[in-house]
């Protein structure tokens, strides 16, 4: 079913551009009459979004908070926020509800925020009754899915496992605190 409730979504992240660009194109998709974009609390203007198209701004990059607010008539009805994150310091494993054990491995900064542009090479291993079936990072990676190591893409790697008894899933990368997830069967 198509959703109709108001929604706004900032495409991408708000970390420094890898290419050093000073001006960053920001796209915002919205189900609202108009969208207003704010950088560190200062308005960058509004765009009409009633035609269902995205709104776009050319924003001078500055670290901090990028906030998009969607309006119906003149009332704010939805918002989306991106924050500049710090450097990755540790890995984190998150279980995803699924028919089979599925995990997302992410990088976190010192404040515990997901670093969306992190790209470390991550090695996975399992202990006990846990077996790694596949890994994937959603890019055009030529490494076969069954290989338990790969480079993170857009700050995430998916890990599929089989669990026959209690055990653990471990993620490790050079220079980062490893992650360990205990699984009880």
Predicted regions and their residues:
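Short beta-strand elements
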Residues: 79-85, 177-185
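Short acidic/proline- and small/hydrophobic-mixed sequence motifs that coincide with surface turns
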Residues: 114-117
């Amino acid at each position: 079913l198509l959703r109709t409730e108001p929604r706004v979504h900032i495409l991408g992240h708000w970390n420094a551009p890898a290419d050093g660009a000073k001006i960053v194109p920001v796209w915002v998709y919205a189900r609202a009459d108009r969208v207003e974009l704010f950088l560190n609390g200062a308005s960058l203007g509004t765009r009409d979004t009633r035609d269902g198209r995205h709104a776009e701004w050319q924003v001078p990059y500055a670290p901090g908070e990028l906030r998009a607010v969607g309006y119906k008539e003149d009332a704010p009805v939805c918002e989306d926020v991106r924050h500049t994150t710090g450097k990755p310091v540790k890995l984190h494993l998150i279980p995803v509800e699924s028919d089979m054990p599925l995990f997302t491995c992410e990088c976190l900064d010192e404040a515990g925020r997901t670093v969306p542009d992190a790209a470390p090479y991550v090695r996975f291993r399992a202990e006990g009754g846990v077996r790694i079936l596949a890994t994937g990072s959603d890019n055009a990676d030529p490494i076969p899915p069954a290989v338990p190591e790969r480079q993170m893409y857009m700050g995430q790697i998916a890990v599929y496992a089989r669990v026959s008894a209690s055990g653990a899933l471990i993620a490790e990368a050079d220079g980062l605190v490893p992650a360990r997830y205990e699984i009880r069967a």
